[in-house]
Amino acid sequence: MAVKWTGGHSSPVLCLNASKEGLLASGAEGGDLTAWGEDGTPLGHTRFQGADDVTSVLFSPSCPTKLYASHGETISVLDVRSLKDSLDHFHVNEEEINCLSLNQTENLLASADDSGAIKILDLENKKVIRSLKRHSNICSSVAFRPQRPQSLVSCGLDMQVMLWSLQKARPLWITNLQEDETEEMEGPQSPGQLLNPALAHSISVASCGNIFSCGAEDGKVRIFRVMGVKCEQELGFKGHTSGVSQVCFLPESYLLLTGGNDGKITLWDANSEVEKKQKSPTKRTHRKKPKRGTCTKQGGNTNASVTDEEEHGNILPKLNIEHGEKVNWLLGTKIKGHQNILVADQTSCISVYPLNEF
């Protein structure tokens, strides 16, 4: 059972982040921002003027009390010890910001917005050094690659995933998730599958910097490998029965958390699955499509009409959590030395699940 952190918000929580020193921050609808201690006690709270939703929060790794928060078109820089007073703020995006990402050297901050643009802010000189405009719809998620401070990946509701280098204003590589799935989508469909286009909601890069994952509205989880100036899809599997709202690699591992609109949270071992695929002599594009079965999944209350093995394309999850609420944000972090999953959903509380076995 999850431990519930309450008392910090009165509206749905939209985003979470943790500092290296155990502080946590959460942003919610209506401009609410709360800081938490490791025991789930609210330590501070502020409400931004304008009451725009707080869509992304991000601690500075080198200065654990410094916090970045996006609300509306604004990025605020705060001291978590005194949230009422902003240290600085930037208004560089023209539409609502959906996601923030810091590069590893902490001199650049990326902000992705509803216009599809990604603004790259030089934090030392306090000015925009790049405006990356290639997404034709909302840019939902952006992430700098660890160990590569000039490289980032992004995804959006235009169903596109992009690899960028800040040396260039154009993406190095683009894939359209819907087009790439055309061949695989042939054959029998599960109910409602055709109604869900591959709108990309969330992106996460593993600590190595070369493996990243994307979650989309079609319920699929895709894992890519960066190969120089292009990427290759290593895996693509049906991870959820409805849209995948969140993907999140655990720190220093290839364990991948995914959360969906189906109210489920799942843990996958991306590394072992990629290794298995590489050892298989069958090319991805020519693999047999699994036959649909009528078995229900073991150990879960589900109406899925396919077996676990078939639904995930022979990829079995390490852990399944029936959370029961649409997942807004997932965070894997250590609390008091133990790995935990923190979940923000449509409620005003934060759910904490221990990951003792890992």
UniProtKB/Swiss-Prot annotation:
Gene3D superfamilies noted in UniProt: YVTN repeat-like/Quinoprotein amine dehydrogenase (2.130.10.10)
Record's keyword terms, sorted: Repeat, WD repeat
The keyword Mitochondrion appears for this protein: no
InterPro entries noted in UniProt: WD40/YVTN_repeat-like_dom_sf, WD40_repeat_CS, WD40_repeat_dom_sf, WD40_rpt, WDR53
Chain positions of WD repeats: 1-38, 43-80, 85-123, 127-166, 173-225, 232-270, 314-355
Keyword Cell inner membrane: no
Domain of life: Eukaryota
Region (Disordered): 273-311
Biased composition (Basic residues): 279-294
Pfam families registered for this protein in UniProt: Beta-prop_DCAF4, WD40
Impact after mutating S60C: In a breast cancer sample; somatic mutation
Polar residues compositional bias, start-end: 295-306
Family affiliation: Belongs to the WD repeat WDR53 family.
Protein name stated in the entry: WD repeat-containing protein 53
Species annotation: Homo sapiens
